[in-house]
């Protein structure tokens, strides 16, 4: 007697109307990205694990808990990509030395998360990446494209909220990390095991903790927006000005 084989847990098949909707979303995305001069790219699904350990961070949940990794016959440590940005950055670093690069992509990503409604172990992302140039207008443009895409899908502005913030410059983040570390060091006995392991190397990751005890400790923690440099505050203000001038509502 034959026994049917089910899809792997956390994955699902796309067929019929679901496939038609999927194709419509992807085609709409590329048509909008193309109007803003983003070049389509596809990077491999399989990458060296080191790429994500270095770019995403060894202490992140993505790398430490959720990534599908394996050793191939040549003893290389490979993985199924958990996100698209790192692969595009690898491509750009290997093929271009300077200039502004604009890429668009879509495809399957893989994370060993607990499956639930709207969350799968194989899921699909669409990405736009602007590499090599920094300006408030570029940040605004990406948000503008995302807003345009959502509206073109027939989702009105009152159906979603746009939340924005700023981590500031690398120097701002480093200074804030030290402040946060000093604050959290007073709660070593109360922090979760995961957060305690992040305290010395990357305390900013503790801000993402889902542990209820950690969340309570973080209520009175320093707030990064209170410690941004003058330059970073001006940069962020320009982004907000561009959004307001173009009728895009947002919350901080």
Regions found by a protein language model. Name each.
Residues 1-252:
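TRNA-recognition modules of translation machinery and tRNA-sensing kinases, especially anticodon-binding
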């Amino acid at each position: 007697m034959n026994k049917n084989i089910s899809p792997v847990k956390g994955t699902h098949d796309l067929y019929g109307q679901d496939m038609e909707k999927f194709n419509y979303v992807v085609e709409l995305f590329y048509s909008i990205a193309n109007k803003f001069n983003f070049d389509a790219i596809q990077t491999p699904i399989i990458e060296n694990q080191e790429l994500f350990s270095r770019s995403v961070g060894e202490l992140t949940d993505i790398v430490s808990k959720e990534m599908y990794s394996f050793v191939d016959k040549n003893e290389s440590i490979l993985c199924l990509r958990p996100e698209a940005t790192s692969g595009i950055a690898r491509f750009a670093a290997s093929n271009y030395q300077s200039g502004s690069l604009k890429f668009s992509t879509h495809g399957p990503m893989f994370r060993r998360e607990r499956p639930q409604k709207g969350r799968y172990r194989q899921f699909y992302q669409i990405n736009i990446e602007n590499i090599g140039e920094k300006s408030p207008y570029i940040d605004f443009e990406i948000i503008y494209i995302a807003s345009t895409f959502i509206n073109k899908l027939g989702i009105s502005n009152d159906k979603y909220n746009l939340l924005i913030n700023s981590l500031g410059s690398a120097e701002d983040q480093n200074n804030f990390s030290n402040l946060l570390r000093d604050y959290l060091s007073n709660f070593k006995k109360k922090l979760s095991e995961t957060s305690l392991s992040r305290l010395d190397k990357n305390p900013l990751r503790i801000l993402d903790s889902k542990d209820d005890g950690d969340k309570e400790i973080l209520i009175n923690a320093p707030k990064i927006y209170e410690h941004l440099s003058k330059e970073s505050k001006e940069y962020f203000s320009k982004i907000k000005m561009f959004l307001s001038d173009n009728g895009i509502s947002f919350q901080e």
